[in-house]
Amino acid sequence: MGSKIFLLLGLSIAFALLISSEVAARDLSETTTEGASLDGGHHGGGGGGHYSGGGGHGGSHHGGGGHGGCHHYCHGSCCSAAEAKALEAAQVKPQN
């Protein structure tokens, strides 16, 4: 009898964690899309994981997964095409 109670309690906790993680993921994705649409300079989500260089954590190069990945990077973060062009123009060219 006691083992059935522990089994039901464990399943209930696992189910509650599953639901709360789904809700948290949905809230995070809504927050991310709202922030990207308000900024206007970014090209959607997908920033983050950089090429790991062999070992360690995975992730694609520049983290631009499926649709709407970042196309321009300024100091390691996503930026608009105009910002990338301005940054490139502002960088000092070495004189050889």
From Swiss-Prot:
Region 2 approximate repeats of H-H-G(4,6)-H: start-end pairs: 42-67
Q: Where are the sequence repeats?
A: 42-50, 61-67
Quote the biased-composition stretches of kind Gly residues, using this chain's numbering: 43-66
Query: What do we know about what induces or represses this protein's expression?
Result: By the removal of auxins.
Q: Please verify whether the record's keywords include Phosphoprotein.
A: no
What is the top-level taxon of the source organism? Eukaryota
Keyword set, alphabetical order? Repeat, Signal
Q: Where is the signal peptide?
A: 1-25
Disordered as annotated region, ranges = 29-66
- Family statement: Belongs to the GRP family.
Q: What does this protein do?
A: May be connected with the initiation of embryogenesis or with the metabolic changes produced by the removal of auxins.
UniProt protein name: Glycine-rich protein DC7.1
- Organism of origin is Daucus carota
Q: Upper taxonomic classification of the species?
A: Eukaryota, Viridiplantae, Streptophyta, Embryophyta, Tracheophyta
